[in-house]
């Protein structure tokens, strides 16, 4: 699965243009998603030196993004005349999501288990939270036809 991840307010507390403190478990969760063979794209308003600072901050903590602010690393206006920063991702993780940003443990469960908000709410009310094996349909070989924000 291709997952676009915002930086300020999502991976770190929002202190733009400075880099805020890491949000609890953000880099650990991102590394788990990479290990699960998801392709992560850094999706941020940062450009130039500020973007490089964010990429380096993540790299120093073991998080290597597939690309930053583009669909693939080599994409430019030279080789793609229709280049746009609007990404073609399967999922977006962003603090500006409707309902706000869940904690990173919840994010991992939603991605790896294919959970939707309504499932998590039902589990919370019933007390039967599923921490089982990740869903095989959520891995990188999943069809890339369905693009969405967090499903409700």
Region spans (language model):
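Alpha-helical substrate-recognition element adjacent to the catalytic core
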Residues: 1-77
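C-terminal cap/substrate-recognition subdomain and adjoining C-terminal extension
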Residues: 51-152
């Amino acid at each position: 699965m291709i997952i676009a991840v915002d930086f300020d307010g999502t991976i770190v507390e929002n202190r733009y243009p400075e880099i805020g403190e890491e949000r609890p478990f953000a880099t650990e969760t991102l590394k788990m998603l990479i290990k699960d063979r998801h392709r992560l794209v850094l999706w941020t308003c940062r450009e130039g030196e500020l973007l490089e600072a964010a990429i380096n901050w993540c790299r120093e903590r073991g998080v290597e993004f597939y690309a930053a602010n583009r669909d693939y690393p080599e994409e430019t206006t030279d080789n793609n005349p229709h280049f746009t920063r609007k990404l073609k991702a399967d999922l977006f993780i962003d603090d500006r999501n409707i309902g706000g940003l869940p904690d990173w443990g919840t994010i991992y469960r939603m991605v790896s288990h294919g959970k939707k908000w309504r499932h998590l709410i039902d589990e919370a009310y019933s007390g039967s939270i599923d921490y089982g094996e990740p869903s095989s349909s959520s891995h990188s070989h999943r069809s890339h036809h369905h693009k969405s924000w967090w499903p409700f």
